Amino acid sequence: MRRAPDRPRYDAPVSDVEVAAEPVATPDRRSFVDRVRNARPWLKGLAAFVLYLALTCAIYLPPIGAAIGTRYVGDGWADARLYRWGLAWTPWALLHGHPPLFASDVFAPAGVNLTWVTFVPSLGIVSYPLQRLFGSLVTLNILMLLAPALAAWATYLVCVRATKRFWPSLLGGLFFGFSSYIAGHMVDHLNLVMIFTAPLAVYLVIRRIEGSLSPIWFVVLLTLDLVFAFGVSTELFATTTFFGAIAFVIALIFSGRDVWRVLRAGLLVAASYVMVGVLLLSFLTNALNHEPTQVLRPVDKTSIDLGSWVVPRQHTRIGGESFTNITSRFTASAQEDAGYVGIVALVMLVGFAITEWKRRSTWALLAFLAIVAVLASGSVLHILGRPTIGLPGEWLTHVPLLQHATPQRFPAYAALALGVIAAIWVSRGTGWTAWIRWVVAGLAAAAILPAPDPSAFHAYGQTPAFFTNGEVQQWIKQDEMVFSVTERPASELQWLAASGFWYQIPQAYIGPIPPEYEGQPIYRGLAVNQLNPYIPTPADFAAFLQDHGVTAVLVDDDAVWKFGPVLHAVGLVEQYQGDGVGVWRTGPAGYVAHDPAAVVMNGDIDHVGGELRAFSFPSVDGPERVRGPNHRTTLFSFYGPTCDRSCTANLQALDTWAGAHPDVRVIAVSS
């Protein structure tokens, strides 16, 4: 007797053929849910992406309104300006025959190796048309808004292969695309939020195991995915590879009769990595040869607390600012702590384990989650800030490339597994239990929804017209050595890119300073709003400018009030002022150091002999700066990014007091 063909097992992957074979309701009786359920797979995928993008915009656009061309979606601090330079650098270098991994016009004349600089070459190449059309600020904002949507969408693709259901898969994508990891790094870390390549790699592997993707296409597509990931972030490439290897071992253990299919897919993955090694040989060689001598971030200070999993941080919409008295004890900062999933998510995991305990895939997913949780805790388990038992995370600091990754970011991969678990658990519910599963999973997703960082200023990001209207070519010679004095760190890179890389600079904010420049703060440049403001002595400044052959100094109009005295003190004279920038050069005597006429203290306040002469701060209400003192007594109130709701009460009390004392100028400053 001929056997009927085997039906797919309960947890077998689903092919496009099976998805298309679902029964279709009659057109005249189809509800909206039925129409979505029976739509073509590509149309469902498009709808999912649009919904994720709409949610992203609803969360992150309100703080800046329609000002996507003038303000940053993130806080606009130094990293954002570094990315704007990086996005422009790679296309320019390729088009002009320069090696993209070496910037000769930064830290000139020696130049700087960019292997360990987050200059995001992959994003620079794919976004080149956007940069040409809209400029670097709009391009950066668009990429930042695309990142959560792409991460959620790639996770949706994974969930669809596991469930063949649209709505559960749509829900599953939320857990990764809007996770605490994404929320924290949306403050400015473009290279870290572009993590969609990780779930996309998982999707391709599932397609290969189920047989719906040919070996050749699988190797080609996975190679492209990995190369793109490496060009976005070497850290994400390393952690994706590491946790992918862990997932592969777990899959072999729990795959049962499918072990050979998993093993064959693993061999093809290895072939893809060989292709990646060939394509990126120069990049990888540079990375290993120029690897920092010390771990960039110590493990004991960059791991998560056990409480991180259930206590929300500031970037969480529900309860984010209610527990700062607890989270202030955690080792990870609010921005970097990716651990939060919430108590409801833990309830969902318990329900998943109880109802699906007979399936191998259940224990494979839970085992992966447990391993991520242990490694994210670093070398010591911290409970509400208190160190307890030792953990195996310390050995990661001895693995090349991976040793510079930080455990506090590892929970991103737990969020990916959590999204798949949510989709599977909801899709398998029947009868009244289905509603219970939907409610629990829906509440878990709602609990992690992010809010824009309350401490972010969303700075204005326009480039001075001097660099875009041709003035820079009139006042600065091509390849001239130029020192930049700016209002914010890394603006010197933004200016350089906007000029079309017209001149050279001896200093820059590029993340870690090259080893040969360590210990010399002037190599980070001079900026008004630095975290650790530095003003050199006239003698040191004059020596630096002379030793590096600097013949012109570009000064932001908003930086003159602070650095004007030291510029005059080394013999510089302003020769041009306009379009937001001044051009300063020396007289016939060259650089001659003498005592400045005023003593400038660290920060944004200029003191001379104890008397407040001038101050300048960004205004929340517009691009103008609050200046003074205008011959009035001035009272300053400084508050930091860890403020909780008590800050609001204090500020309201301060506002009431200011209204009763019109003779005193009261200014609240976010530090």
PLM features per residue range, with description:
Residues 647-671:
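Structural microenvironment flanking redox-active thiols in thiol-disulfide oxidoreductases
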Residues 1-63, 265-274, 354, 360-368:
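Start-transfer (signal-anchor) and selected internal transmembrane alpha helices
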Residues 77-94, 266, 277-353, 404-407, ...:
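Periplasmic/ER-lumenal interhelical loops and adjacent helix-loop junctions
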Residues 16, 295-297, 442-599:
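Extracytoplasmic
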Residues 39-40, 255-267, 349-390, 431-436:
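Membrane-interface helix-loop-helix junctions at transmembrane boundaries of multi-pass membrane enzymes
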